[in-house]
Every structure is written in C-alpha cells, then in structure tokens.
Amino acid sequence: MTTLDHVIATHQSEWVSFSEEPLFPTPLEGGTEEHFPGLSSSSDRSESSSGENHAVDEGSQDLSHSEQDDSSEKMGLISEAASPPGSPVQPTPDLASAISNWVQFEDDTPWSNTSAPHKETALTLTVPCWTCPSLDSLRRCPLASESSWTTHSEDTSSPSVAPSYTDLQLINAEEQASGRASGTDSTDNSSSLQEDEEVEMETISWWAGSPAMNGHPAVPQVTTARFPSWVTFEDNEVGCPSPTVPSPKKPNAPSAATAGPDVPFNSTGSFKRDRPKSTLMNLSKVQKLDISSLNRPPSVTEAPPWRATNPFLNESLQDIQPSPINPFSAFFEEQERRSQNSSISGTSGKSQRDSLIVIYQDAISFDDSGKSQSHPDAIEKLKQLQIDDPDPVGNAALPDDDPTASVEPDAPSPTSALSQPRDGWPMMLRIPEKKNIMSSRHWGPIYIKLTDSGYLQLYYEQGLEKPFREFKLEICHEVSEPRLQNYDENGRIHSLRIDRVTYKEKKKYQPKPAVAHAAEREQVIKLGTTNYDDFLSFIHAVQDRLMDLPVQSMDLSTVGLNYLEEEITVDIRDEFSGTVSKGDNQILQHHVLTRIHILSFLSGLAECRLGLNDILIKGNEIVSRQDIMPTTTTKWIKLHECRFHGCVDEDVFNSSRVILFNPLDACRFELMRFRTVFAEKTLPFTLRTAASINGAEVEVQSWLRMSPGFSSNRDPLTQVPCENVMVRYPVPSEWVKNFRRESVLGEKSLKAKVNRGASFGSAGASGSEPVMRVTLGTAKYEHAFNSIVWRINRLPDKNSASGHPHCFFCHLELGSDREVPSRFANHVNVEFSMPTTSASKAAVRSISVEDKPDVRKWVNYSAHYSYKVEIEQKKSLKPDFEGEDLENPKECGVQ
C-alpha cells in the first residue's frame, strides 16, 4: 500500500502546477456521449507509463490519444479519492483519510462527496480569479483572508512537506468535478507556468455544480478567455469577470453542435508545456503584462461588480461649482476645432466621481472596467474644470473693478503726511556717527533738506545758507525699518538709518549645503525725531527720491558675473490709510498705495516681464506655463496713477499692460507704485471708542472685536493675524504729568494692569492717579507718540476665540475742571501690519525671464494699515458699564 508520505514526496511539485489545459478531456471530433464509456482503454496506457505509482494511477483515465503527461498521476490520485461508490476503482483507505485530514485544516468536519446531477438545463461557467493559481481552483474564489498574497509567497524557496492551502483548493475543485461527471473521468493537468513566457489561454466552458461548496454558492455563468497570467493582490473581490474572445478553431477541435446534450464540457484545443523544475510554489517569476485584457468589457453576471476604492476621491468636493477662470481656454478651443473636422464615436458611461481622469486604452481607473469615457467628453470636462473662486460675488469682498468706470480712488487727506510737500525737517543726528569705545554717543538737533537732484543737506539749524554736510543718494541706498530707541528721561525717539547695501552670494554648509544671497549693510547716516508725523514725512520723501534716481550705465564688471543660483524676488506692499466712522465703523475715506520692489540675481543681461491682475488684460494673457505664478485671489483690479522706475519701458506697458524691465543687478529697488480701491468692505477688526467728561473726571473706553466680514477672518484655519497692533489715544500736554511716576531710576510711565486692581503708590498733586485696564496686551503713555498706546502683539490672540471682544478702560481724576482743555482730539489712531495679505488684491500672475527658465522666483505680500477712528462723545459711560460703580471700574472682565 502506498503510504501518505510517499505520495506527498512523489507529487510535491505537482500540487502547485498552474494548469493551462481544460478541466476535462476533449472528446474526439464527431463523437457523442456514447464515446465516454468506451474510452476506458486509455487508462491502461496511462497505467503502463507510470509504473512507479501503479496503485494510485490505476483509476485515472485519459481521453486524449496524443497528449500524455506525468500530471495524470496526480489527477488520477484525486479522481480516486473523490469518485462515487459506483466507480470502477476505489481509493485506498489511508489515502482517503489523508485527504480528509487535509480538508479538516479548513473546516472542522471532513468533506462529503456530493454528486451533482449529470444533466443541467443551462451551461454555466466558472468565474476566473486572478488570485487563484490554476484553472482547477477556479470553482471557488477565495475569500479576502484566503487570497492574501502572504499565503502564496510565504516561503517559495524551500519545499514543504505539509500541503498548502492552494492544494486544498485544487483537491476541492477536482473532487466536485469528478462527482458531477463520473468516477472514471480524469483530466490532464500537467501544463504549468514557464519562466519568462506568455501563457495563452483559450476559451473554456464546463458544467458548474449546483450545490454549494464550503458554504459558498455556485457562481453564475461566465466565459473565461485569455485571462491575465499574472497575480494581483486585491481584497474583497467578488468576481473578476473576463470577456469572451473567440479563438481560431483547430482541425481537431470539436464544434458545439457535435456535442450531445449530456456532454458536460466543451473546450477548444490548447497546447501543453513541460513542467517547470521548481519547488512547491514559486510566484516570484511573474509573466508579462497583457494590457489588452484590461480593456475588454466584462460579462454580465448576477454577482455585484467589484469596485475598488479611490483614495484620491473626495466626496465632499462634488458640489463645488466651477469658476469662470480657465487659463487653458485657448488650448481647448483649438482642440475643439480639430475635433469638429473628424467625427469620434464612443460611448461614455456615467462617471461615479467628479474628479476628472482621462481614461486611455491602457490606463487603469478606479471605476468599473465596463464604463469608458470618450476623448471629446474628457476634453469637455477639462474645459469646465475651474478653480473655486475665493472671492465670489455673493460674499463681502468686492467684485472685479469696472475698467470703464470713472470712479477714482480717494485723494489723500490734506492733513496726511503723504500730501504735504516739505522744504525740510527738524531732526536729530546721532553723534558720533560710528561707535567709539572712548566716547559716548548722543543726539544732536539738526535741520535736513532734500534737493530734487537727490542730495541730502544737513544744517546745524534752520535758516543757514551753507550745510555742514552733504551727500548724494544712490541706487544702492536703502531706508531701514523704523524703530524706537531710548532718548531721554521722558521716553524714546523714532530712529532710522540710511544704509549702503551690497548683496553677495555665499555658500553655506550647515546644516546642509545651500547658496544664500546675504546683505551687507554699511551705515551712512542715522537720524531720529520725537515728532511721528515728521518722521513719516521724511521717510516717504526719501523713498520717492530713490525711485526717481536715473539709471546708471551698466557696470561691465558685473555683466559676466555668474551666480550659482539665479533668483528674482518680488515684494508687494500695500499701505492703507483712511478714516472710519464712529459706531458702525464704516470707511469714510481711504487711500491705498501699492509698492512693488525687485531684488534679482541674474547672470549677464536679462530682460524680465511682470504680469499683474490688471483688469485691462483680463482674458488676453499670453505667458509660458513655467512663468505662471500661483495666486490666492481671482479678483481683477484697476490700476491708477502708475509710476515706474527708470528701468521700465513705459511704452510697452501702455500698449500691452505688461511691465517690461531690465532689473538692477544685486540691488533692491522700487519698480513701480500705483493706487487702487480698497478690495474689502470692512477692516480686519472693528474698534468703538467712547469718552465722557464729568467735571474733573475723564473716562475713556474702547471695545475691539474681529470683523466677520473681512475675507481673512471667515475661515479660522486660514486666518491671517494682525501683528504689532497699536491703538493710540492722544493725551493733552496738561495731562502728561498724571501718567508719570517717580522711581529709583527716574520718571517712568504708568502701565495698565491686566485683569487686576491698580495700586500706583501715593496720590499725585492734581488728584488720584489714573486707572488703566486692558484685557489683552499692554497700555501706557509713550512720549514718542504723545499718546496712551495700547499695544497688542497678535490679534486675534492664540488663547482666545476669534470673535472674543477685548477692552481698554482709562479713568482719570483731574485736580479741577480747569485742567480740561477746550478742544480735544476727536480721533483714535490705529496702526498694524498683516503679512501674506493684500489690501488692494494686487497679485503677480506671471514672471518671465528671457532665456532663463530655471530662475527661482519668489513673491511676498504684506499690508500695512494706518487709519483714524472717530471717538463718541458721551455725558456718561454708565449705561455701557451696566450700572457698575465708576470709582471701582471692572468693565474689562476676565477672559
């Protein structure tokens, strides 16, 4: 008797053979069902060719007279184990029990041989599955856990004595097939996958048993043809249908008409290959990919079609409406004209997703394989593909400017520092100009004049004819950022520097190798003043003169200079100034000035083109794809009162609205400036200020809250904070002494207490000391502004909600009502900055550098706001305090 170990050792390479032959033998041409009982003689020839395993192979039968293989031994073995009691040869008890034990690895109870009826009313086919290794195992598609790739590729290099799960599927499928047909029928299942060869599978049809196997119902009728010879690993696969492809008939292939109604199979001819010399399973040798199999429409089955999940599909974006902006309209119009000349026929299925993927014949999509999309439909969808407009008409932002409208932006206020031409400015000069260890530096009063030719003249005092020093402004000069510096015992002073700046390319190695263009500053002069209006007026005058400097001839020493990294930086800065009404915070008057600065490092001579979102060129832009710059707005604006640097070709701008210029090498300069209309309906936050004077008591209170109508405040995730917020309350000169106190180091300004009671020491000569409270930031009197300054570093605060209000309160008791001046300042000054935003909505849409496509391009946006808010005059703030005691104010509650 053949033992189980001998059988396993003999057929260990046959358990995983990939079959290419039909599951059942092919009948002779012209034969009917009477031929099957008479074909038992072929089993004798099979027995004679396999003397090694005679006891196992004596029940196998081969219907093919020309093709014989060693795999008939395995099929005979399985046929004996699964044949009904009426079969000529019964399997040995040991072998049957061994196979039953294998099955118990899958289920707790052994399989029972279920005999299927020999006649069926309809021809059913098995569903091929790519995860099944052979045709014999196609009777049952494994579950998701069973079809895991780790089951097949656990250890392909070493043979295993224990039977694998793939062999159990093979035995299960053949056991069901032998039960339906007859116990004497067997098949030649010897063909296997070859290394680096394409497996050609022909159309196969056979009977499908009605009873369920392992709890899985039989699959509906499907025709398999040329299914791919590779293995894919996908879960939750119900079925992988493959279309029917007619194959050419061979001379010895029978026709469907010659087969009798009781013939349980009908297969066309196939060819046989030698068995590979390998161990149990070796799936590492993958066959060539057959792209054509992906494009065939699947057969209609009763099972629901399987559809993979698209990880890039966002269902929440289905309701987004298209935007009118389409930068590729010219391309699609040309494609549409070409497509009209030739008619393209195709059927397009209903797409189950809104995101567009053009499906080519060799592309794999996440939709059903039976649903296709024609090229014209894809082009039509691309034409409608539009970006969501961040500034729709329905929101608080203003629509595009009207190019035909005659509305001009408001002129600067007559009291503004921008509109007042000055002959000179009283300033303070830092002496000595350079630091010296042996001497101390101090501030000395001077008078400064700025000539039209760009000369800065310094006088000891106003009215002198001859300056004691004079120097000329150059294109490499820059004005530093304004800052506050210690001045005297009263407070600080506004200071600035005029520097000579040169940029050099330096290579850094830490923390990683990089090339940086560092600025080296050399101080030319340092000036200061305690008058903030004079300070701003002088800064704007110097900036205007630097922009009007004539362009010098090109330095030939820098023409041949080659930079390791070429780059160009564009800085857009908006300056907003205006007046806001009291109560409702409506903008009564505003002025928006936009400045564009350029800093470039380009080798040799380079001609640059800059494109803005000018309303006059809307729809007429012609730029290269690599020159398009990303923008955060789709608004188109109208430019007013444009002024240009000397390197800009104004004739080209007037004709094409494109800024054509030759940038200065390694020098930051102002390219142009223009005025626009404010692009928002509200300011970033609202400020309401009320003041009351009752005899000798003065009270001032402000409420600050973020404005929901501002575009940046609509989404908390993309909200841009206001930085360095200053709210200045002008203080009459008679009241300054009430806000000063003596200390060990001299007089200091009183500071506001945050959410706690105030105790400022002894009372002053004119009454009790003032009480100041704030809920956020700090507040104190600053002599540089002659005002009480409420400073907030960041608004909204990180620890508070966006809509949380903040409060400032000040209570002052004077010595008598005679100290109350007859006239008060009726405005509160507000000043702050916002990075990465634009008050004018001006945006750079394209930057082109001639013959330099690899130049690094940078665009920076910033906005600076400075405006006045009217103060509400009230007899008493008690209604606003909700009846609380004025002498013990607690209006600013704890957050």
From Swiss-Prot:
Chain positions of motif NPF 2: 326-328
Region of interest: Disordered: 10-101, 144-204, 236-279, 291-326, 386-424
GO (cellular component) term, any one: cytosol
Principal cellular location given in the protein's record: other
GO annotation, biological process: clathrin-dependent endocytosis; hematopoietic progenitor cell differentiation; regulation of endocytosis; synaptic vesicle endocytosis
Superkingdom of this protein's organism: Eukaryota
Changes after translation: Phosphorylated in vitro by PKD.
InterPro entries xrefs: Adaptor_comp_med_subunit, AP2_Mu_C_sf, MHD, SHD_dom, STON2_MHD, Stonin, Stonin2_N
Gene Ontology MF term list: clathrin adaptor activity
Family: Belongs to the Stoned B family.
Complex and partners: Interacts with the second C2 domain of synaptotagmins SYT1 and SYT2. Interacts with EPS15, EPS15R and ITSN1. Interacts indirectly with the AP-2 adapter complex. Interacts with TOR1A and COPS4; the interaction controls STON2 protein stability.
The name this protein goes by in its record: Stonin-2
Lineage: Eukaryota, Metazoa, Chordata, Craniata, Vertebrata
